[in-house]
Each structure stands twice: as C-alpha cells, then as structure tokens.
Amino acid sequence: NGPMRISGGAGTGKTVIAVHRAVELAKRDAAGGREPQILLTTYTRNLADDLRRQVAQLEPRLSFTERLGESGVMVSGLDRVARMILQRAGTEIAPIAQEVIGQPRKQVLTYPRANVWQEVLSLVGGGLPEGLRSADFLESEYEMVVLPQRVATLQQYLRIRRPGRGVALDRRKRAAVWRAIEGYRDRTADLGVTSFSEQLALAAAWLDQEAARGVLRPFRHVLVDEAQDLSPAHLQLLRALVEPGPDDLFLAEDSHQRIYGKKITLSHYGIQVRGRSRRLTRNYRTTRQNLDAAFGILDQGAYEDMEGQAEEHRYVSPRSGPDPLLLHAVDRADELGKAAELLTLWLGQDRDSGLDAPESIAVLVRDRYQRDAVVNGLAQRHVEVRAVDREAVGRGRPVVMTMHRAKGLEFRK
C-alpha cells in the first residue's frame, strides 16, 4: 500500500530480501502484462555492482537496462541516475536551477574538483561568528537545510525551520551564513561546477515538474539497499523517481552502519512508512563473539532509525567463531608493522592449506588518505595489497578500502 522499510544489522538478510523482492516484482509485472520498470539502487558503485551480480545469479533470464524509460531492471547508484536525468533535461534545466539553487544554470554536469567551501570560508569567514567558521558546518547546513527546502533567497532562509541541526542561529547569524552560501553558489557558477547534492536536487525537481505536465515517472518500483546514509537530496530523488502507490518504494537500512552521523527522518521527504516497517534480528553472517565485541561499543551510544525512533541493537547469531583480536600500537609505524606481520601470517596459513583467495582479506580504514598511506606502508614492509575505490574488488591481493566502500561487502578476514 506504499513505501516499506526493513531494518537490521549487517548480516541479517536485508540485501537478500531486496534482491529477491526486485526479482519477484519483475516477474509479477511481466505476468500481469506490464513491462518491468524497476530500479535497485544503493549508495556506492561497489555495492551496485555486487547487487547486479546477485540479481543475475538469482534469475539469469531477467532483463537488465542501462537507460531510463526502458523495460527491465536497472541496478545503479543514485548519483548515476541523477546524471541520466540531467542529461535528458539538457539546457531546459535552467528554470529548475533558478528555483532550486537561485541561479539559472544551463550546464550542471561537471563536479567540483576542489573544496569550494574551504575556499569560500577563506574569503568570507571573517564575517561569521567563531563557532560557525567551519567548511564542514557550512556544507552540512547547505545540504541538510537549504537544498532540501529549495531556499533561493535570504528572506526564505530567515523563515525556514532547521530541526535537528544542533546549532541555533538567530537572524544575524543566519544572514552571515547566507552570505557564505551565496558566495559558494557564485563561486561554483564561475567555475561551471555543480555538486553531487545539487545534481540530485535538480534531478528530483525536474522529475516533479515533468510529472506535473503528465509525463510518467521513470520507474514503477524502486528498491534501496544501505539506505541509512542517504542524504535529503537522495531521498527527494527517490520519491520523485516513482509514483506513490503499492510497492512503490522499499528501503533496507541499519542505523548502526550510518557512517556520516546525519540523522534523517523519512517522513520529512514524503516517504511515509508508519505501519510498514519490520526489523530483522537474526544475524546470519556475524559470529556471537563479534556481536558481543560490537555490543561493548554500541552500548555506549544511543541510536535512532530513519523514522526518529529509538533503536535497540540486540541480535542473535547461530554462528560461533574466534574471539576478535585487538592489537595495541604505540604509533603509526608500529601499527603498520603489526598489520604486516598479521597479513603475512594469514597469507602463509592460506598457502599451507591450499586456499588461493587473498582478495578475501581486507584492511579497512577511515578515509582514502589513510588508505593510500597503508598501501604504501605495507609495501615498504614487503606486503603487496591493492587499494580499492570505485572499481570492483580484483583477485590476487588483499584489499585496502575505506569503511564507506566496504559497506555491505563481506570478507573472510
């Protein structure tokens, strides 16, 4: 009867359900004489590639599509879908851009290559109160408040609500923040660039305009894996991609895997799931020992789901395994040395047992800068590993990737 949300920890079967549901909806539509128009999407390209493999394995005869409006199942990241929409809109996006970002831009497909917010802060930061002189704060305010509400003027910004932001802004502070936002928009216009979030917002607004003119929305069903890290602009695009109705939106999420710490409430973006939410508590991937170790960390915090409800994190697991090993290091060199020793030990054990799958061993890090430093540091210690970003995990070496890129993937060690 409308959008549905399932939640659960890593290994509880959320992705399995999403994949089976996509295949079942495609079969059901085909049996009913309707062309399947289904989007199965997630946050990163790595996960999208993995989802496509799983769908093809479950139903080899299923038709995939790479183009909007064609029959079949599209498996893609949302950023890529937004670009398809903007390519279709062409220069006609200008009036939409005026409405969404306050400037009638005709070219919106080029991304910024540098931190424009930091550049703007260096120019206008002196006019901001000390507690607001942060590029991260300005970017977050823009993406969480300004873009979702399509604020184009100072007068609009002075009136809007800012729930959940944690920083109160009076009129004087809002005016100072708005000067920075205007500076950002002017600078990106000069550079001819448009951010990912702006592209998502523009694509959503374009689809809403087309629907108001009687144009059908691109999909009949949209399914989302790893929904907890989607931004407001992502959620607005999801809502715009499919007409409200039975089986329109399906979201799988886990608040404990939220990387960016920005709490989002689905109902604020037209996605009503009240009465259509289910929680999975049986963990098929993680051992009891790993769960116990994780609970020791999670018990120190409080978590909310995508409807703003407090979320408990007690899961059960039928699997048992070794206790997690926590290694203490005095500095980065010591840390790399211990990591190299452990990787060498594991690879040697695999060779002795006849197992040839080094790519099933992963080193997870905080960001891409640490990733590159770890790859170089391990190479200096004669351990060859492979850095993984947007590309698929290759064979032949252990992999090093950020927690962001590892989301939803599974490794042996």
Question: Could you describe each region identified by the protein language model?
Answer:
Residues 4-36, 43-58, 62-71, 76-93, ...:
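Conserved helicase motor core of SF1/SF2 NTP-dependent helicases
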Residues 119-124, 141, 183-184, 202, ...:
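A general alpha-helix detector
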Residues 193-201:
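Short glycine-rich substrate-engagement loop in P-loop NTPases that contacts/grips substrate
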